[in-house]
Every structure is written in structure tokens, then in C-alpha cells.
Amino acid sequence: MGKTTTIGSVELERYVQSAFRLQSGDTVVYVDPHRLDGGPPAALILITHEHFDHMDPNAIAAVATDDTVIVANAACARQLQGKVKGRVVSVQEGDTVTEKGVEVRAVAGYNGHHPRGFNVGFVFRLGDQMVFHAGDTDRVPEMSQFGEIDVALLPIGGTYTMAEAEAAEAVRMIRPRVVIPMHYGYATGGDPEKFASLVGPDATVVIL
């Protein structure tokens, strides 16, 4: 079990690394599920890229049903097709799909460890919240073009992603109401309290 918070009509639960469950009403969305052994059945699973701590077939199997839709980039989709329950939908940066009543837009997310196209972020509306999950990325210029974001889920761990200071600069580009740090304290460092102090009044930081 992870730590939970509720923002508007959406309950968010953060597990390890960048793994989240988001639920509004009966619609359950997981993003990058990792090291899960169960949970509410998924309507939708979003996978940002194929690294083991983001695309975990065992965790997907723990929450997927035959009715689940899995949205992932092409490399992940190829690996998952026919190996997990549910229907797999392949996307690339710039694509928008609507599945299970949720409109999902694949957006830019990249750095030296994750070349452009290897990782995608996801912007999606669930309930009354517009959510952005960055996957593994640094601050990139495209972030200023994502439109209105209520809740941003941003990596802060450094090494493979942006660290606290760069993530705080990303907050100023994205302009979310709420930001939840992720991708820290597992395979990398990262201090969520330091990140919160750097964000200051620019957004409400919720640490899970």
C-alpha cells in the first residue's frame, strides 16, 4: 500500500518510484505500476517507457483484467502485446487517444538517459482534474505548451531525471496548482522537502 491524497474528485495513491493509482468514481487509472501485488482492477494503465521500474509486467498483471486498456509507447506496446491481459494501444509523442472515457495525450519527456521518443509523458483528464505524469525527463521546452494542468507528477531524483532545483523550474513552466514529487529514494536520491522549499509559493507540494 502507498500513501494517498484526494484532490478534487480524484484519489491518488503513490507506490514506489513513479507508480501511481488514480481513481475518480469507478474509473481506476494506474501509471507506471511497479512492485504491486494487487489493487483495484484497472480501467486504464499508462506506461511511460520500458525501464524495469516503469514497465513491470508482474505489476501490470496484478491489476489488469481482460477489459483493461494499456496505453504505452511503441517499444513497450510490442513487448506487452499478447503477454498481459487487456488491450494494448501504442502511442507516440503528439498522439491523443480516448479510452475508458479518459482522453490521454502523449507529450514530450526526454534527457540524455532517455532520448526523445523513448519516454513519453501523459496529460489526461480524470474526474475534475487535469493530470500530468512526466515519466523520466529533465525540464524541456515543451512543458510550457501543455496547457492547464491541475496536478503534476514530477521526478526529482537526479541521475536519470531532473533533480530538485530543475524540477522546481519545471513547475514554473507547467504552472500546476498541485505538484507531487516522484522518482526519488529508490534507485536514486532526491529530497522532497528540499524540492518543496524550492517550489515555494508557485504550487502546492503534496509529498506522498
Model-derived features: positions:
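Core dinuclear metal-dependent hydrolase active-site scaffold
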Residues: 1-40, 90-147, 162, 208
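Active-site metal-binding motif and surrounding structural segment of the metallo-beta-lactamase
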Residues: 33-79, 148-153
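Redox-cofactor binding/interface segments in oxidoreductases and associated redox assembly factors
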Residues: 46-47, 105-107, 154, 181
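Cap/insert and terminal regions of metallo-dependent hydrolase folds
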Residues: 69-72, 139-208
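Short glycine-/acidic-enriched loop or helix-start segments at secondary-structure transitions
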Residues: 32, 40-41, 56-58, 80-82, ...
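Active-site regions of enzymes building and remodeling cell-envelope glycoconjugates
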Residues: 42-49, 83-93, 103, 202-205
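Short, acidic/turn-prone active-site loops that include or flank metal/cofactor-
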Residues: 35-36, 51-52, 75-77, 93-96, ...
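Short glycine/proline-enriched coil/turn segments at helix->beta-strand junctions
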Residues: 25, 40-43, 65-67, 82-86, ...
